[in-house]
Amino acid sequence: MTVGILALQGDFREHEEMLRRIGAPTLQVRLPKHLDRVERLIIPGGESTTIGKLLAMYGLIEPLRARVREGMPIWGTCAGAILMAQRIADGRADQPSLRLMAVTARRNAFGSQLESFEIDLPVEALGGESLRMVFIRAPVLEDLGDDVTPLARLEDGRVVAARQANMLATCFHPELTSDERMHRYFLEM
């Protein structure tokens, strides 16, 4: 099973390294033809507006949507979660996006880069066990659709991880820790 990692911008190398550590073959995805060679895809953190523009420039938006509709598992971390959201609360209407998951993403929900933080929180998908979460200019997920399951919440109740069928979104960066559990969870989806 080859895991594609969108490699247009952002921290795709960290995801690639994590997957290599756990023995999963990877392929950097930059063009639509690369999608034919992967069974699942990770959209990394980075800058959502830039990644969205590059998705459009390289003709990846429609092929990606089609593969996800066919059942390919997809995981967006931070900026990737924003790009997967059907709605972006504070985004521009013309911002290129995948608009796949029935959630609203609120960008930079914690403020600027200076307000970045780490916290340990329980994750439903991991049997309620705690996971170290790194938040860097992170979004939160709001207005979850009926078929979207929240997987992790902050102490104030805001959702920071969710799943809808074959789609996983995390507002934090598991790839920036040494904990492999979220990557293993994605491989089992």
From Swiss-Prot:
Pathway: Cofactor biosynthesis; pyridoxal 5'-phosphate biosynthesis. It holds the Pfam family SNO. CDD domains: GATase1_PB. Its EC number is 4.3.3.6, 3.5.1.2. It catalyses: aldehydo-D-ribose 5-phosphate + D-glyceraldehyde 3-phosphate + L-glutamine = pyridoxal 5'-phosphate + L-glutamate + phosphate + 3 H2O + H(+); L-glutamine + H2O = L-glutamate + NH4(+). GO terms for molecular function: glutaminase activity; pyridoxal 5'-phosphate synthase (glutamine hydrolysing) activity. L-glutamine binds at G46, E47, S48, R107, I136, R137. The active site is at C78, H173, E175. SUPFAM superfamilies: Class I glutamine amidotransferase-like. Keywords: Glutamine amidotransferase, Hydrolase, Lyase, Pyridoxal phosphate. One of its GO terms (biological process) is pyridoxal phosphate biosynthetic process. InterPro entries: Class_I_gatase-like, PdxT/SNO, PdxT/SNO_CS. GO terms for cellular component: cytosol; glutaminase complex. Catalyzes the hydrolysis of glutamine to glutamate and ammonia as part of the biosynthesis of pyridoxal 5'-phosphate. The resulting ammonia molecule is channeled to the active site of PdxS. In the presence of PdxS, forms a dodecamer of heterodimers. Only shows activity in the heterodimer. Belongs to the glutaminase PdxT/SNO family. HAMAP family: PdxT. This is Pyridoxal 5'-phosphate synthase subunit PdxT. It comes from Roseiflexus castenholzii (strain DSM 13941 / HLO8).
